[in-house]
C-alpha cells in the first residue's frame, strides 16, 4: 500500500515539474513580429507556424496578450500595418491586412481581407497589446505637453451712458446726448491726454474824463463837492480833493499875482463874479457825477482805468 502511494506522489511531482518546462518551451517556440502597430502584432511558431483558433488564442495568452479583433487589425492597417499572412482574430475568422495590392497576398486585394475558414484550419494569430500607447512600438513618440495659458484680457464691455447735458457746440439744442462707450482691455495701456484752456479777456479801457473847475471860497463849497461824488470810489474822491487843493493854491497865487498889476474895481463885483462861476461849476460837477454813477451801475464788473483830469484856471477881470 505504501509502495502504491509513493508511486503516485512520484508521478504527480514529475507531472507538475514538467508542466512549467513545457510551457516555457512553448513560449520560446513562438515568434512575434518585431514591431507592433497600434498594439497589433503577428504571432506564429518557429517550427510549425500554423495554429488552429484554440492554439492561436492560447499563444496570445502565453505572451501576455489577447487575440485581436477585426476592428483593431483594421485600425492598425490604417496606420501602416501590412502583412502577407492570414491570421486568427477574436471573431473566429482569419484576416489579412493589405495596403498595396499584391497577387501573392490576399488575391491582389486591399484593406482588411476576411477568410471565413473553419476553426480547425491552421493560420497564424494577430495578438493585441492594450498597454501600447505608441502608434509604432519601434518608433518612440515625443509627447509634447501643452499647459493652458490663462487669458488675462478683460472682455470688452459695451454700456450705454445717457446724459441730460446738451452739446457744448450747440447750446440752443434741446436734445439730450446719448453716448456709447467701449471700455478698453486691462492690457492695453490707457492713453493720457492733457487739455490746456487759455481764457483771454479783452477789456476796453474806459476813459472817464473829469473836468474840475474849482475855486473854493468857503467851507460850504467842500460839502457840496463831497455830496456830488457819493457814487464814486474813495480813491477818486481823494484824487479829486488833491486836485481841488492844487487848483485852489494856483488860483490864489494867480489872483495875488494879478491883483498887484490890475487892481479890482470893487470887492462886490469880484465876489459876485466868483459866486456866479462857483455855482456854474457846481452844476457842471453834479451833471458829471450823475453820469459817472450811471456808468458805474450799468457795468459794475468792468475794469476801470485811472481817470484823466484836466485843471482849468479861473481868470478874473478887474
UniProtKB/Swiss-Prot annotation:
Glycosylation sites: 52, 129
Biased composition (Basic and acidic residues): 284-305
Source superkingdom: Eukaryota
Membrane topology (Extracellular): 24-234
Keyword tags: Disulfide bond, Glycoprotein, Membrane, Receptor, Signal, Transmembrane, Transmembrane helix, Transport
CDD domains assigned: Link_domain_CD44_like
Subcellular location: Membrane
Stretches assigned to the Link domain: 39-129
SS bond partners: 60-127, 84-105
Disordered: region residues: 284-318
Primary location: membrane
GO biological process: cell adhesion; glycosaminoglycan catabolic process; hyaluronan catabolic process; positive regulation of cellular extravasation; receptor-mediated endocytosis
Protein name (record): Lymphatic vessel endothelial hyaluronic acid receptor 1
Chain ranges on the Cytoplasmic side, renumbered to this chain: 256-318
UniProt-listed SUPFAM superfamilies: C-type lectin-like (SSF56436)
PTM section of the record: O-glycosylated.
Physiological role: Ligand-specific transporter trafficking between intracellular organelles (TGN) and the plasma membrane. Plays a role in autocrine regulation of cell growth mediated by growth regulators containing cell surface retention sequence binding (CRS). May act as a hyaluronan (HA) transporter, either mediating its uptake for catabolism within lymphatic endothelial cells themselves, or its transport into the lumen of afferent lymphatic vessels for subsequent re-uptake and degradation in lymph nodes.
Topological category with respect to the lipid bilayer: Single-pass type I membrane protein
Cellular component terms (Gene Ontology): cell periphery; plasma membrane
Leader sequence residues: 1-23
Transmembrane segments: 235-255
GO molecular function terms noted in the UniProt entry: cargo receptor activity; hyaluronic acid binding; transmembrane signaling receptor activity
Subunit structure, interactors included: Homodimer; disulfide-linked. Interacts with PDGFB and IGFBP3. Forms a transient ternary complex with PDGFB and PDGFRB in TGN.
